[in-house]
Amino acid sequence: MDRRSRTPQGQIAQVLVEFLEVAVSCIVFLKGFYPPRAFERRRYMNVVVQKAVHPELASYIHSTTTGLLPFIQKGLVERVVVIFYDKEHVPIEKFVFKLSVNQSYGSKLEEADLEFALRAFLIKLTVAEPVTKSLPSDGSWEVTAYFRSLPSYGDREAQLWIPTDAKLWMQAPHITPIKSVSCDPLKMQLYLEHPSPTEPKNPAA
């Protein structure tokens, strides 16, 4: 379906999943999780970004972000989180995209305004390294989505998502805001979460 023939919610969902695919790639590059040759400099929304080109890495990022399309369109997705773990699978850093798509918005979507707003997120990501934490060499990472309500059990796309087994922090996390935007029909925040300095060493499962 041509993007212009979609509802505003469908249009914004398509733009968002394309943006999230690039943003996740930039985050993973920023953290130095893979050799630089796994990425390639590209221009997206007139910003130079690092796009994953390693086949397995690129496929994982693409499938997880595009898999969110129908749920973002329906307003079901509350947060998309890139979580980095230590070897015990305990989260040590989270990049959180908290989003809300106005389901009653019926006006024509100005994609130029939306892309201008999203471009600012990518620019912020390129300079976010000083507020991040170094990662252990034996760690791991994943993309996790948090839903406002669960999709229907018979939803074929929903069956591609499985519950996460990530351990939880016992204390409220330390939050570092990176960027926020309110551009109807989209509201989105990007922030970092780190464990509290008083966090117990063995979080609950």
Q: Model-derived features: where do they sit?
A:
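Long protein-protein interaction modules used by eukaryotic assembly/scaffold proteins
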Residues: 1-59, 64-205
